[in-house]
Amino acid sequence: SSSQTSSSQTSSSQTSSSQTSSSQTSSSQTNSVTVPLKFARYIPPKHFELTGDTQKQSFIKLVLPLILAVNDELLQRRKAVEAAVETNDRNMLDQWAVLYRIDPENFNDIELAERLLRRVDTIPVALALAQAAVESGWGTSRFAQQGNALFGQWAWTESAGMRPLAASNERAVVRSFGSLLESVRAYMHNLNTHQNYKRFRDARYRLKPKAEEAKASRLAVYLDSYAEIGQAYVKKLLAVMSSNNFDQYAEAKLG
């Protein structure tokens, strides 16, 4: 499991569909992929019997809808922040600041708004898919199977997760979740709040006007601190995104 700092769980956001164990993605190879509104709570046992490309496709069908759903939640949050900025609602901005681990007392209205807009934003779909694939072994790791842990997030309280067979810190556990969706939420909140990923967020802010398919590979280079292997981890993410054509999902939508 890759080494990574833990983050506090985001407050539960509402996702409007029922939980199911299967999902289908469009066969289109364009960036207008439509993904049915179906979510898996956990990785089904049959997934572990699959091999090769069949297992990879199964994993994508399980995880892609979850990534899109949480990105949609983040877009709604961003709109709420932008609305608070427009109306000069400092009380609401302060509440968002606390959730996104910013001390509001340190900033005036303009400074706080900019810092929030650097944090409350989506994660490129191809990048999230690649990290889930690498961190969970395409959904085959025992942490994914037993703890719904797709992204190898560390926690420091034993009751919060599962102990790895080898870890550089004896107190470290891989954080477990009640569902796969919770795992995706926590992963995105971690990238959006932890100090280790400030360079990632700053680069995302600069790339905001660019096309979505151009962002994943350009932002991956800022995730060297996600794993102990550093730049080798970045190279692995880039290889997974490229060899599996994950950019085809850059503009994917739930529908």
Identify the role of each PLM range:
Residues 1-9, 14, 19, 24-130, ...:
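Catalytic cores of secreted/periplasmic lytic hydrolases that degrade extracellular macromolecules
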